Regions:
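A conserved beta-strand element that flanks and buttresses the S-adenosyl-L-methionine
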Residues: 103-104
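Class I (Rossmann-like) S-adenosyl-L-methionine-dependent methyltransferase catalytic domain
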Residues: 1-97, 114-118, 122, 132-200
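Hydrophobic adenine-recognition pocket in adenosine-nucleotide-binding enzymes
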Residues: 107
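Helix-to-beta-strand junctions that scaffold the AdoMet/dcAdoMet cofactor pocket
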Residues: 112, 127-128
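Conserved acidic residues
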Residues: 100
């Protein structure tokens, strides 16, 4: 997350962000993600934000690591989840064969589109064989700063183009949903579940 304005946004609006995300009911997508994983899978919440999803996975018996680029959100999520949330910028992430599942919910959409293939490749490398990743992006064709944060929006077509240089994933599911937060109107999200099927 190289865009300083995005991290500045979360620093200035920590409480508002937590209030609008931490108690949102996201269990349908959480459970769908878990259905692709073995029992007792080891998970990474990549860009955990308020800690909502980390806590859900822990409460359901999974071993979870969590990280975020915002120091302020790391503090909130650590207190909320009961585990130490690691402060790390996305570009500093470098793991290999460590996780059965990676949850990147509304996180890597803060990167530039040109940065996403490298980021997704590094997430691929962090997965064990047959591991699964969930990613979500705002739906559309926009790229740039909006409401104080940098966003890359994607559609099914632009996601497929983005993935062309990346090998070793099988697409399990890709679908569009509405925003589950209140007062978000017709805002839509692109949801993606991929499985690692080969080792690069």
């Amino acid at each position: 997350m190289r865009e300083n304005n995005t991290l500045d946004y979360y620093k200035l609006h920590t409480a508002d962000f937590v209030n609008t995300t931490q108690n949102v009911d996201f269990h349908e997508i959480q459970e769908l993600f878990l259905s692709f994983l073995p029992a007792k899978a080891k998970l990474l919440d990549f860009g955990c934000g308020s800690g909502r999803d980390t806590k859900y996975f822990i409460d359901n018996g999974y071993e979870v690591d969590a990280m975020d680029g915002s120091k302020e959100l790391c503090k909130v999520a650590t207190k909320y989840t009961g585990i130490k949330v690691q402060h790390m910028l996305f570009e500093d992430f470098n793991e290999c064969n460590a996780y059965d599942g990676i949850w990147a919910c509304a996180s890597i959409l803060h990167l530039k589109k040109c940065e996403l293939p490298d980021m997704i490749t590094r997430l691929y490398q962090a997965l064990k064989r047959n591991g699964v990743i969930y990613m979500s992006f705002k739906y559309g064709d926009f790229e740039g700063v909006r409401n104080g944060r940098y966003f890359t929006y994607l559609t099914e077509e632009s996601f497929d183009m983005l993935m062309k240089p990346i090998h070793g994933f099988m697409k399990e599911k890709i679908w569009v949903t509405g925003d589950v937060r209140q007062d978000r109107g017709t805002e839509q999200w692109l949801n993606i579940i991929l499985r690692k099927v080969t080792t690069i």
